[in-house]
Amino acid sequence: MTHPLVSIVIATKNEENNIENCLISITEQTYPNIEVIVVDNNSTDKTFEIALKFTDKVFNKGLERSTQRNYGMAKIACGKYVMFLDADMILGPKATEACVSMTENGNWIALHIPEFVLGTKYFTRVRRFERSFYNGTVIDGARFLKKSTFVEVGGFDETISGPEDWDIDKKIKQIGNIGLL
């Protein structure tokens, strides 16, 4: 079985308290062919230095996640597939393997990866409660997609700050099916 390359692009800004756990979760993936790209937004903490411990593909670019993600994809990523993560996300060990399998063997050009909110602080519990009412297709944008799909829809709209993932999700739905992991 071949294992097409998956490019994981992480947009960061002052994420020294989160980025290491995110990157550790990527190193623990059962899927064997992953490149990690971190695109930082001028962090004033140790985010950049921590990321360099895990990958040499760490760049300082962009003012918003849209710009950062587009830079990571258009200028750096070599994979057949791309996964977009935020620095405070942690992947289960089989997440990448499951995404590739579903996309290779199904009729999907992209996948929603539901987020599970962890932690015990008050607002974390509120967020977890709120998210319990939604499925992955309602509140999350597609996080795993074919690079060719990304190119076809023109990437992220760099004029949008905030709901850029919903915008690209809408564009992807116009050309194909999005599955749910």
Each language-model region and where it sits:
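N-proximal low-complexity "stem/linker" segments adjacent to membrane-targeting elements
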Residues: M1-S25
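A conserved acidic beta->alpha catalytic loop
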Residues: S25, D40-F48, M89
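Glycine-rich, basic loop-to-helix element that forms the pyrophosphate-binding segment
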Residues: N60-A77, T137
